Swiss-Prot record:
Transmembrane regions: 6-26, 104-124, 137-157, 171-191
InterPro entries per record: TMEM204 (IPR038992)
Protein name as annotated: Transmembrane protein 204
Species annotation: Homo sapiens (Human)
Main location per the UniProt record: other
Keyword Ligase attributed: no
Function: Can influence paracellular permeability. Appears to be involved in cell-cell interactions through adherens.
Residue numbers on the Cytoplasmic membrane side: 1-5, 125-136, 192-226
Induction (UniProt): By hypoxia.
Signal sequence coordinates: none
Length: 226
């Protein structure tokens, strides 16, 4: 059985979502923070970097001699206090921890959906394109990714006065929308197939059967493809 174009398109959309999700995770441009002394820095899920103060025409005040202040970065992890510097540390720490967890779960779900598609192409009995659970498994994986990304992004609905959302956050919003689109395409395809199969079988009886005293005639019938 050849893979339908709609299924292949949904998997391709989910692959783009997976790429955008990883790009957003490993860049340091999730939010931009401004400190009281005028310095600015960009904070990501796993690292933060100081930014050059171009308005002053020189290096940032916190730069030390012999170091490039444009990318003076530090790694972040679970429960990092640095992400909440200048803001309510408890709130910001919870926001980033929640987003890290949701990002990892979404990456795992999108990857599982891609592997399910590839294993179906190989021809495994349980995950073959002929199996009814093949598309359902991919749709469930993509929908899970969309759901957890929404949960993580909602935590950034309220941010402090010194913090602004940056382009990595909007990139992750795009990944969430693409994952939702991929799941919706598969769900629509599944429901469309079921509607076709729920139609009653069409049986056309030959007119010759109505003739009297004639035997041995076979039924001429046409059944639905399901």
């Amino acid at each position: 059985m050849t893979v339908q174009r709609l299924v292949a398109a949904a998997v391709l959309v989910a692959l783009v979502s997976l790429i955008l999700n990883n790009v957003a995770a490993f860049t340091s441009n999730w939010v931009c923070q401004t400190l009281e002394d005028g310095r600015r820095r960009s904070v990501g899920l796993w690292r933060s970097c100081w930014l050059v103060d171009r308005t002053r025409g020189g290096p940032s005040p916190g730069a030390r001699a012999g170091q490039v202040d444009a990318h003076d970065c530090e790694a972040l992890g679970w429960g990092s206090e640095a992400a909440g510097f200048q803001e309510s540390r408890g709130t910001v720490k919870l926001q980033f921890d929640m987003m890290r967890a949701c990002n990892l779960v979404a990456t795992a779900a999108l990857t599982a959906g891609q592997l399910t598609f590839l294993l179906g192409l190989v021809g495994l009995p349980l995950l073959s394109p002929d199996a009814p659970c093949w598309e359902e498994a991919m749709a469930a994986a993509f929908q899970l990714a969309s759901f957890v990304l929404v949960i993580g992004l909602v935590t950034f609905y309220r941010i402090g006065p010194y913090t602004n959302l940056s382009w990595s956050c909007y990139l992750n919003i795009g990944a969430c929308l693409l994952a939702t689109l991929a799941a919706a395409m598969l769900i629509w395809n599944i429901l469309h197939k079921r509607e076709d199969c729920m139609a009653p079988r069409v049986i056309v009886i030959s007119r010759s059967l109505t003739a009297r005293f004639r035997r041995g005639l076979d039924n001429d019938y046409v059944e639905s493809p399901c």
